[in-house]
Curated annotation (Swiss-Prot):
It is found in: Cytoplasm. The keyword Cytoplasm applies. It holds the Pfam family Transglut_core3. Keywords: Antibiotic biosynthesis, Cytoplasm, Plasmid. One of its GO terms (cellular component) is cytoplasm. This is Microcin J25-processing protein McjB. Along with McjC, necessary and sufficient to process the inactive microcin J25 (McjA) precursor into the active peptide. NCBIfam families: lasso_biosyn_B2 (NF033537). It comes from Escherichia coli. The lineage of its organism: Bacteria, Pseudomonadati, Pseudomonadota, Gammaproteobacteria, Enterobacterales. InterPro entries: McjB-like, McjB_C. GO terms for biological process: antibiotic biosynthetic process.
Amino acid sequence: MIRYCLTSYREDLVILDIINDSFSIVPDAGSLLKERDKLLKEFPQLSYFFDSEYHIGSVSRNSDTSFLEERWFLPEPDKTLYKCSLFKRFILLLKVFYYSWNIEKKGMAWIFISNKKENRLYSLNEEHLIRKEISNLSIIFHLNIFKSDCLTYSYALKRILNSRNIDAHLVIGVRTQPFYSHSWVEVGGQVINDAPNMRDKLSVIAEI
């Protein structure tokens, strides 16, 4: 399993330690991320991270884009869609409890370990199904008694869509000065539960 995920934001290097569920920032090292020899020559203390299995993510397309740090808001349910039955809501809530409890207790490592690797295809006729599953999840998510944040919501949405044979990916983005991390879901390279230009605002440190 990958131990570290790395990316850069402006001049900063950001490291995600999956096992310890923590982020680290190394100022002025970001520009050397893709030049390993130069990076380790100038920052020899980073050799520890490169001796383990690691992944290098993508850099924000426009780090000058303003990004308002604010509390994450749960997506509003789509009132134009048919609401799922109470039984389905109950089953969905149990899944959310399971995902959020494990994320709260076991951290990022559990997400990587439990990630399913099946290859699935996406077609445009699945857009209605995606909208419906987002709406259904939003209806019950406020009842979650465990960790409720963008990571939990996005991971739950990814797993729900995967179970419907949709190749959804959890994406984790970061920025620095001040530090901020955020999670969203993409299908076919498109953001489905957040602003479409998230990759312009944040550097992607992990895709699951």
